[in-house]
C-alpha cells in the first residue's frame, strides 16, 4: 500500500487558515486532520478532541519528555504538540494527513528531515488586514493581539522556507488554491485527486 502524504500548513493567527482548512477538508476525500495537543484555553465553540486535545501544562510536559510528540513548540504563551503515533498510523494506512501547526513546529520538522512533507504557508494580504481580523474575532485580549501581531512579522518572513505560499485576500480563491495544491501533490505521487493510487498497466 502506498503511504499517505503529509501536508504541513502554517499561518499567522487571524490569517484565515482554520476557515480555509474547514472548506477544503469538507470537499477533499481521504484527507484527515491531525488534532494537536495544546495547553491553551478553548475558545468559544471549540471542542476537546475535535479542534484540539486540551491538556494541562504538567501533562503536556510529561508527554513531551516521553517523546510522544512528532513536534512541539511554545507559542503565544502556550504549548502545542503533534502526536507522532496518530500521524504515522494514518500515513501507513495510505491516508493523507494535514498538520495545522505554527512556524516553530514546522521548522522543527523541516530541519529533522525525518518525514517527507509538503509545506504550505497561508498569509494575509498585509499586517493591517491581519490586525483587523484579530480584532473582529473578539476572542483575544489587547495584550494577546499585540503579542500575535508582534510574532506575525517574523512568521511572514519564515514563509520563504515553505513549498507554497497562499495569500488569503479572497477566501474562495484561497480555498481553491489549497485544494489544487493537494491534488497536484497527489498526482506527483501517482494518486487521483480523490487520493486513490493510480494503477498503471505495463505491457
Curated annotation (Swiss-Prot):
Its EC number is 2.7.4.8. It is found in: Cytoplasm. Keywords: ATP-binding, Cytoplasm, Kinase, Nucleotide-binding, Transferase. SMART domains: GuKc (SM00072). It catalyses: GMP + ATP = GDP + ADP. Pfam families: Guanylate_kin. The keyword Oxidoreductase does not apply. CDD domains: GMPK. This is Guanylate kinase. Residues 4-183 form the Guanylate kinase-like domain. ATP binds at residues 11-18. The lineage of its organism: Bacteria, Pseudomonadati, Thermodesulfobacteriota, Desulfobulbia, Desulfobulbales. It comes from Desulfotalea psychrophila (strain LSv54 / DSM 12343). InterPro entries: GK/Ca_channel_bsu (IPR008145), Guanylate_kin-like_dom (IPR008144), Guanylate_kinase (IPR017665), Guanylate_kinase_CS (IPR020590), P-loop_NTPase (IPR027417). GO terms for cellular component: cytosol. Essential for recycling GMP and indirectly, cGMP. Belongs to the guanylate kinase family. GO terms for molecular function: ATP binding; guanylate kinase activity.
Amino acid at each position: 500500500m502506498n503511504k499517505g502524504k503529509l501536508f504541513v500548513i502554517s499561518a499567522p493567527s487571524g490569517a484565515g487558515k482554520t476557515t480555509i482548512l474547514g472548506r477544503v477538508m469538507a470537499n477533499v476525500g481521504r484527507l484527515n486532520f491531525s488534532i494537536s495537543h495544546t495547553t491553551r484555553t478553548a475558545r468559544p465553540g471549540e471542542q476537546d478532541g475535535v479542534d484540539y486535545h486540551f491538556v494541562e501544562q504538567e501533562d503536556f510536559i510529561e508527554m513531551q519528555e516521553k517523546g510522544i510528540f512528532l513536534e512541539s513548540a511554545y507559542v503565544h504563551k502556550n504549548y502545542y504538540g503533534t502526536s507522532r503515533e496518530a500521524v504515522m498510523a494514518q500515513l501507513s494506512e495510505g491516508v493523507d494527513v494535514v498538520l495545522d501547526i505554527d512556524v516553530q513546529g514546522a521548522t522543527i520538522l523541516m530541519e529533522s528531515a525525518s518525514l517527507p512533507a509538503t509545506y504550505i504557508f497561508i498569509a494575509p494580504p498585509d499586517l493591517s488586514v491581519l490586525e483587523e481580523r484579530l480584532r473582529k474575532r473578539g476572542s483575544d485580549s489587547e495584550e494577546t493581539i499585540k503579542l500575535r501581531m508582534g510574532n506575525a512579522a517574523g512568521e511572514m518572513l519564515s514563509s520563504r522556507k515553505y513549498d507554497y505560499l497562499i495569500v488569503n485576500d479572497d477566501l474562495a480563491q484561497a480555498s481553491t488554491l489549497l485544494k489544487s495544491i493537494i491534488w497536484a501533490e497527489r498526482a506527483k505521487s501517482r494518486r487521483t485527486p480523490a487520493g486513490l493510487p493510480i494503477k498503471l498497466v505495463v505491457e
